[in-house]
Amino acid sequence: MADLSTSVAGIRLENPLMLASGILDENGYTMLDVMNNGAAAVVTKSIGMEERNGYSAPVIVEYGDSLINAVGLSNPGIDNFAEEIRIAKRSGKPVIGSVFASDAESFVNLGRKMQEYGCDAVELNLSCPHVKGFGLEVGSDPDLVEDIVNEMKSKISVPVFAKLSPNVSDIIEIAKAAEKADAYVLINTVKAMKIDIRARMPVLTNAYGGLSGPAIKPVGVRYVYEVKKETGKDIIGVGGITTYEDAVEYIMAGASAVQIGTALYTVGKSVFRNIISQMNTFMDDEKFHSIQDMVGVAIR
């Protein structure tokens, strides 16, 4: 039997599958449930300094087997999130705190809180594509990205992950600006829109949102490949992973672990155990003894 354990920035995972930020991760008990169903770690919902209601419905629209969402970074605020982290930590598995802000000082304050609450790492949401003043507007500015990452690394002791956007002209430039991060998370959603041709208007209240799911997988695989080849840094791949083949593609492109989100909506929590079982069979058949044996093997 193959060894499915892996590590990212020194954090050991029993398998390479993590829950991505944005689904079943605002509540400690749902995070526990996901880990009990096979996820090796969870990433929390992106949390800001203050409570935020987000956009009014509709905030999600189906696009084939993918989704377009514009939830609007709704969250309870960092001071109201401590108990959810503590509950999730009962699993004994890594819990990564996702945070968003518009400036380095606020990011650092959020990171300190997540560390204080017991998070094993902090993921910087530098890439949400549908909220003004946050996410993509921050993550497309190399100087600001560098300032945020460097400040965070100097102020907290747990690993820092930088979640980067595909909606930029040069992702390598942004990755290099975030080079002091302990790992990259690639990719966030792709800016997208769906029109209701009868109503003659966008379906989402916010007009545009972020496309996730199988539709973006080739984009995610490409960026993991490019950034791994250029930087050699640990990478967590995310975007469209539904099957073991999807996960293996990301790993062969250079990811040490992957995150799963939309498949929780389209397939359900069984996606974790299904992928683990089928990946194990694949690795035995292909004579891969460990996840590390597969990481980056496709890079030329």
Curated annotation (Swiss-Prot):
Binding positions (substrate): K45, N69, A70, V71, G72, L73, N125, N188, T189
Cofactor(s) the protein requires to work: FMN
Alphabetized Pfam families for the sequence: DHO_dh (PF01180)
The record's free-text note on cofactor binding: Binds 1 FMN per subunit.
Protein origin, superkingdom: Archaea
UniProt xrefs under InterPro entries: Aldolase_TIM, DHOD_1B, Dihydroorotate_DH_1, Dihydroorotate_DH_1_2, Dihydroorotate_DH_cat, Dihydroorotate_DH_CS, Dihydroorotate_DH_I
Keywords: Cytoplasm, Flavoprotein, FMN, NAD, Oxidoreductase, Pyrimidine biosynthesis
Catalysed conversion reaction: (S)-dihydroorotate + NAD(+) = orotate + NADH + H(+)
Enzyme class name: oxidoreductase
Any one of the GO BP annotations: uracil catabolic process
GO molecular function list: dihydroorotate dehydrogenase (NAD+) activity; NADP binding; uracil binding
Pathway where this protein functions: Pyrimidine metabolism; UMP biosynthesis via de novo pathway; orotate from (S)-dihydroorotate (NAD(+) route): step 1/1
EC number, as in UniProt: 1.3.1.14
Family, similarity comment: Belongs to the dihydroorotate dehydrogenase family. Type 1 subfamily.
NCBIfam families assigned to the protein according to its UniProt record, in alphabetical order: PRK07259.1, pyrD_sub1_fam
UniProt subunit comment: Heterotetramer of 2 PyrK and 2 PyrD type B subunits.
Function noted in UniProt: Catalyzes the conversion of dihydroorotate to orotate with NAD(+) as electron acceptor.
This protein's name: Dihydroorotate dehydrogenase B (NAD(+)), catalytic subunit
